[in-house]
């Protein structure tokens, strides 16, 4: 059996599903999002918008951010910085917003912001379960490479750490029903890809794939 046809089918269905399945994180202007899932965060939105957004995949995500509310004092604006926070959370097909503390003035903020309590809330106002930690760097804090620091943190296995990407060769696959197991040597790569995408697909996609190859 030519395995390329079902491979193309499941690949197309998987990509189609991924294209419409995402988490939208809204980032207010007093939050600096440094890193999302190991990469420098790329936000969408106009320059002067009160908040911007970033699209994240369904499932587990990790972010690195800092909260810096501003306060007016005479003609000056005073910013008070939180710790740099690394956090992981899981969500699917939803919009998320930061829920952050509000302080009466900069003096109160300076006293309390290092121990701030914050949440990510979904469209129904429910808090998303998260794990957080401080992303600490000793010495001078100028010119920090947050993506590198997040990668190093993940290697330590901290409470907000996420696993590194798994290679195709190490993924445990389940056999596809009714697919011939004997293939020519030249089809090995295609078979591995087929197993990979099948294992990544949701149950609905798997069902459509089985129906397709049984035609």
UniProtKB/Swiss-Prot annotation:
InterPro entries: UPF0319 (IPR018635). Keywords: Signal. It comes from the Bacteria. Residues 1-21 form the signal peptide. Pfam families: DUF2057. The keyword Nucleus does not apply. Belongs to the UPF0319 family. This is UPF0319 protein VVA1446. It comes from Vibrio vulnificus (strain YJ016).
């Amino acid at each position: 059996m030519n395995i390329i046809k079902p491979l193309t089918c499941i690949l197309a269905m998987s990509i189609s599903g991924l294209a419409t399945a995402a988490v939208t994180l809204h980032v207010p202007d007093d939050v600096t999002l440094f890193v999302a899932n190991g990469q420098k965060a790329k936000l969408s939105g106009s320059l002067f918008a009160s908040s911007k957004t970033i699209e994240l995949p369904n499932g587990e995500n990790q972010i690195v951010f800092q909260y810096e509310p501003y306060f007016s004092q005479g003609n000056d604006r005073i910013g008070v910085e939180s710790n740099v926070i690394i956090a992981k959370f899981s969500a699917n097909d939803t919009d998320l917003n930061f829920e952050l503390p509000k302080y009466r003035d900069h003096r109160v903020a300076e006293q309390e912001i290092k121990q701030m309590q914050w949440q990510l809330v979904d469209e129904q106002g429910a808090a998303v379960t998260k794990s957080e930690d401080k992303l600490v760097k000793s010495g001078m804090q100028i010119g920090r490479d947050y993506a590198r620091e997040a990668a190093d943190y993940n290697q330590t296995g901290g409470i907000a750490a996420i696993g590194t990407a798994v290679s195709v060769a190490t993924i445990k696959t389940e056999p596809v029903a009714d697919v011939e197991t004997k293939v020519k040597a030249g089809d090995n790569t295609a078979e591995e890809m087929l197993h990979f995408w099948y294992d990544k697909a949701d149950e609905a996609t798997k069902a459509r794939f089985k129906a397709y190859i049984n035609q």
